[in-house]
Each structure stands twice: as C-alpha cells, then as structure tokens.
C-alpha cells in the first residue's frame, strides 16, 4: 500500500492550489447545531487544523457519505435536508473559488481513504500497545485494509 499511497500523493500535485486554513477532521460529529435554526453554531476539534489544500480537506469531510454508520444511508437523508454527494460537491464548488475535474476528485477521494486507513492503522497500534482510548478501537484493524482498497478503487476510476 505504501507505493499506491505514494502514487496518489504524486497525482495530487495536479494543480498548485492556494493554501487555506483547513480543519483536518471536519464532520457532523465535530459541530454543534442550533436546534432552533438547524444551523451550525460551533465547529469543534481543531487540533488537526493547519494551512493546507481546501479540496483535500473537503474530500476528507465527504468520506461521511461512504463510511459513517451513524448516519446510515446518507444519500437517502432528504428529510434531514442532507444533499446527496453529487449535489453537495456541486454546492461546494459553486460557493468556493475552486474547480475540480472528475479525475482530480477521484484522486483526492482516494487520498482521503488512504489517510483514514493510516489513522485506523495508528489506532490498531495503540490497541496492540494497550493505549487505545475508544471502546471500539479494536474494530479499526478490520477497516484498515478495506479503506486502503477503497482508496485505490477511487484512484483507478
């Protein structure tokens, strides 16, 4: 997987995008929603924030559409006003200064899957060492290879 990861990283140099402040772990689990307005009132968990590529940050955020068991089938969440992935991506591109081709999108999504696989592998190491904090941390071992495989499928599209 290391060689595949290196290939994905080299492909991400497709465009020289401007650097922006990126969250690093933006997801629905890291926001507080105002129950009266249904709008995000706070964004939490900024310890991974840095200056970086906003498209990479957005694509990592979009992994929720593929791997978030809490939300179930997020593409079926119209009643919650959650758009499907294609609509969400289009809205982001329309409201940002960035454009991304389908090929670039797949490369960025593959990179995001590899990133999450690396995080899962790190958690697996903490389970092995007895330093894992989460009660379900031992389940990450099973997901590491699957995430890397899914990342590679994206890159090959």
Regions found by a protein language model. Give the residues of each.
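Active-site acidic catalytic loop and adjacent metal/ATP-binding pocket
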Residues: 11-56, 60-62
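Regulatory N- and C-terminal appendages and interdomain linkers associated
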Residues: 122, 126-157
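Solvent-exposed, charged/polar functional surfaces in cytosolic regulatory/catalytic domains
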Residues: 11, 91, 95, 150
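All-alpha amphipathic helical-bundle segments outside canonical DNA-binding/catalytic cores
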Residues: 99-111
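Active-site activation/catalytic loop segments of kinase-like enzymes and analogous catalytic loops
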Residues: 56-97, 111-129
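Conserved NTP-binding catalytic cores of kinases and kinase-like/nucleotidyltransferase enzymes
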Residues: 32-41, 71, 97-100, 137, ...
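Single conserved hydrophobic/aromatic residue that forms the stacking wall/gate
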Residues: 1-9, 13-14
């Amino acid at each position: 997987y290391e060689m595949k990861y290196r290939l994905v990283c080299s492909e991400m140099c497709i465009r020289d995008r401007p650097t922006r402040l990126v969250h690093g772990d933006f997801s629905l689990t890291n926001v507080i929603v105002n129950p009266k307005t249904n709008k995000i009132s706070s964004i939490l968990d900024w310890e991974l924030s840095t200056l970086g590529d906003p498209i990479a940050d957005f694509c990592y955020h979009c992994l929720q559409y593929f791997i978030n068991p809490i939300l179930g089938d997020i593409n079926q969440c119209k009643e919650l006003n959650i758009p499907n992935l294609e609509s969400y991506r289009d809205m982001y591109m329309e409201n940002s200064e960035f454009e991304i081709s389908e090929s670039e999108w797949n490369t960025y999504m593959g990179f995001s899957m590899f990133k999450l696989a690396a995080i899962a592998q790190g958690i697996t190491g903490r389970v092995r060492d007895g330093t894992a904090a989460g009660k379900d941390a031992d389940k990450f071992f099973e997901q590491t290879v699957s995430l890397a495989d899914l990342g590679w499928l994206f890159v090959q599209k």
